[in-house]
A protein has these predicted regions:
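Terminal RNA-binding accessory module
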Residues: 1-69, 338
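Short beta-strand micro-motifs enriched in acidic
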Residues: 30, 39-43, 127-131, 188-190, ...
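Internal alpha/beta scaffold segment
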Residues: 148-183, 189-193, 202-227
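Extended interfacial segments that mediate partner engagement and assembly in macromolecular machines
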Residues: 53-65, 71-182
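Residue-level signal for inorganic ion chemistry
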Residues: 18, 33, 76, 394, ...
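Hydrophobic beta-strand signal
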Residues: 37-39, 125, 290
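Rossmann-like S-adenosyl-L-methionine
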Residues: 6, 12, 203-449
């Protein structure tokens, strides 16, 4: 059944939101302020889902998608929306999370951190599938809401030279003896070279290896192989094992990593984010700082250039070992210490055992830092870090943890804002600042009063 809708807003799945007698209608393919005709494709008691068939009144924020696969490929969902409007939607999602979950408003909204809208994705997991009906191998992202692989020959969010490899990769995989036993290729773009991690379910032949080597020479890539679980990951040639690194030039740091290590997808934004976090923390040279969920030391090492001591804590000993090596390479080993701990199961006694921290940076995965927030809330006022900067990749868990820090721990939210780490997607990265005992208080909503 087709109906006409006026779109009020957009959700993070890029669906326009309309209302009919108070019931939410999520309209795929529609943008705010548009009037569209759409088919209802699903009915639920509390909402309905519709798909746009025609646009009666078009939004001034609608733009022509750059990618020919947009609409089919699940890698991007907002290419049809002006980039400024994309950021505004993410900012609203952040503010809504604080209001509805944390029961507070943001007293000072930080200007959004933005970088290039295209060619920014330096990490990617590409699916591979041999499609007999099409007579070819597909290499790309999954189709939206599907397990099928998009039939794509270019990708504008990947660096251009990686996009240019999509068709040659198809041809390469199609030439291998196990062309139907390769489910994915992970891409990790470093400063000097690009690593391709090939997941293969059966052994490669000598001829296959020759093919990989020839591709490596033509495209300046290094191959890594994974035959089973994560512990089977290895470089095709051992002498290339240490070729990946990224630079943090404002701190004079070179950060080595492996293709399976977590690094930020967007190098441009990562540099801006580190600088912003350090500026907000305002660390003094006599202060002791904690960096929780420190990973490879992405924040730890820059912090060590200004602090008296930085303690980096992470759940993976592999990552903390690499962080320690990087600190030593930059003569920062005297100012850094690393510990391997499960930060999802910490308590206040654990926190006290680490000693007092003047400042703290928290950069958790999507699950957030619930246990850490609870532990901080139980500290006495004199034991607390005076300032916390929280970097988040999930506005819901950030808001949950913020509620604990503010309503139970006596902290004040002083500022928060979005970081557009993933343009053209619904992913919301953000940064928030909390202060103990001073600073502008977050304004509680009526529900929290």
């Amino acid at each position: 059944m087709q109906e006409t809708f006026t779109i009020e807003s957009l959700d993070l799945e890029a669906r326009g939101i309309a209302r009919r007698e108070g019931k939410a209608i999520f309209v795929e393919g529609a943008l705010p302020a548009e009037k569209v005709r759409a088919d209802i494709v699903r009915r639920k008691p509390s909402y309905e889902i519709a798909r746009t068939t025609s646009i009666i009144k078009e939004s001034s924020q609608r733009v022509t998608p750059r990618c020919p696969s947009f609409g089919t490929c699940g890698g991007c969902i907002m290419q049809h929306l002006d980039i400024t409007a994309q950021v505004a939607i993410k900012q609203r999602a952040l503010e809504d999370g604080f209001r509805h979950i944390a029961k507070m408003t943001i007293p000072r909204v930080l200007p959004p951190l933005q970088g290039p809208a295209w060619g920014y994705r330096y990490r990617a997991r590409l699916s591979v599938r041999k499609v007999i009906k099409k007579g070819k191998v597909l290499v790309g992202f999954h189709e939206r809401k599907s397990r099928y692989v998009t039939d794509m020959t270019e990708c504008h969010v990947l660096p251009p030279y990686v996009s240019d490899m999509l068709v040659p990769l198809r041809e390469l995989i199609g030439s291998l003896s196990i062309d139907d036993k390769i489910p994915q290729i992970e891409v990790a773009v470093g400063e000097a070279t690009t690593a391709l991690l090939l997941r293969h379910l059966e052994p490669l032949t000598a001829v296959d290896i020759e093919q990989l080597d020839a591709f490596s020479t033509r495209h300046n890539v290094v191959w890594w192989l994974q035959s089973k679980g994560p512990d089977t990951v290895r470089p095709l040639h051992e002498e290339q094992a240490d070729s990946l690194y990224y630079l943090l030039p404002q701190f004079g740091l070179k950060m080595p990593y492996k293709p399976t290590d977590f690094t930020q997808v967007n190098y441009f934004i990562n540099r801006s984010l580190i600088a912003k976090a350090l500026n907000l923390l305002d660390v003094q040279d006599d202060e002791r700082v904690a960096d929780l969920f420190c990973g490879l030391g992405n924040f730890t090492l820059p912090l060590a250039t200004v602090a008296r001591e930085v303690v980096g804590i992470e759940g993976s000993s592999i990552l903390t070992d690499r962080a320690l090596q990087a600190a030593s390479q930059h003569n920062l080993q005297e100012k850094t210490r690393f510990a391997t701990l499960n930060l999802f199961e910490v308590d206040v006694a654990w926190l006290r055992n680490l000693g007092h921290f003047d400042r703290m940076l928290i950069d958790p995965p999507r699950e957030g830092a619930h246990a850490v927030a609870l532990a901080l809330a139980q500290l006495e006022p004199q034991e607390r870090p005076t300032r916390i900067v929280y970097v988040s990749c999930n506005p819901a868990t950030l808001a949950r943890d913020a509620g604990i820090l503010v309503h139970e721990g006596g902290y004040k939210l002083s500022a928060a804002g979005v970081v557009n780490m993933f343009p053209h997607t619904g992913h919301v990265e953000s940064i928030a600042v909390f202060e103990s005992g001073s600073g502008d208080a977050a304004k509680p909503t009526a529900a929290a009063q």
